[in-house]
Design a protein with these regions (language model features):
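Lipid deacylating catalytic domains
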Residues: 1-69, 76-217
């Protein structure tokens, strides 16, 4: 278990402040990132803000590698971060990532209808929404870096093939973006009420799976 948790607040001008302090000998510290302006339209800005958090962690705590856990739109911000800064060796390097309810190829009733888009066995979507096309460079960025990926999504089992907000096809389309580049890629599907979009990250089984994946030797 980890006791060391701090929160990084990013103001709308991109300034980062930490609430709390990490001990120098902290094992597996957790940094929760809260963006003051967390909206879909600002992916490149959000990615830059995410980088600001990492550089501050680097200078204050000597972080040289990190694991990422994201929910919903946060996954897209992180994909944009990796697309823009993933090859920058001066930054802390990604070790493992957990994507929960990822919106890689859209959000229901925003840019796709229920059961409109499917993915094939490689995770390739039958229609690609923005910014999915641009994100296809991730395959090259993830190559040879030894990154491990756990992709968690929920199916309400109500015929929508979704968690109520995000289609399973949108979440599973991450597989096609990364191809064989990660060291490992695994999907984990949760079903029924506890798999609802907002419930997923409150779900104890999800929490346990995440802890195992990130920290079990």
């Amino acid at each position: 278990g980890t006791k060391d948790i701090i929160t990084a607040y990013v103001s709308k001008d991109g300034a980062v402040t930490f609430k709390g302090k990490l001990r120098k000998d902290a094992v597996n510290p957790i940094v929760k990132i809260e963006l003051e302006n967390n909206r879909q339209g600002y992916l490149d800005k959000n990615a830059a803000w995410f980088k600001n958090v990492l550089t501050k962690l680097q200078s204050e705590y000597n972080f040289d590698k990190f694991n990422f856990v994201g929910h919903s739109m946060g996954n897209l911000t992180f994909a944009q971060y990796m697309m823009t800064y993933g090859n920058d060796k001066s930054l802390p390097q990604l070790n493992k990532q957990v994507n929960i309810a990822g919106t890689f190829n859209g959000v229901l009733n925003m840019n796709e209808d229920v059961n409109e888009i499917t993915v094939d066995k490689d995770g390739k979507p039958s229609r690609m929404n923005q910014p999915y096309q641009q994100l296809r460079v991730l395959k090259d960025i993830y190559k040879g870096k030894g990154i491990e990926v756990l992709n968690i999504y929920g199916d309400l089992k109500d015929g929508t093939h979704s968690d109520g907000r995000v289609s399973n096809s949108s979440s599973k389309s991450l597989k096609y973006l990364l191809g064989n580049s990660p060291k490992s890629y695994r999907e984990s599907k949760y079903e029924g009420e506890p798999a609802q979009h907002s419930q997923l990250h409150e779900n104890e089984n999800v929490a346990n799976e995440l802890i195992d994946f990130l920290w079990k030797k």
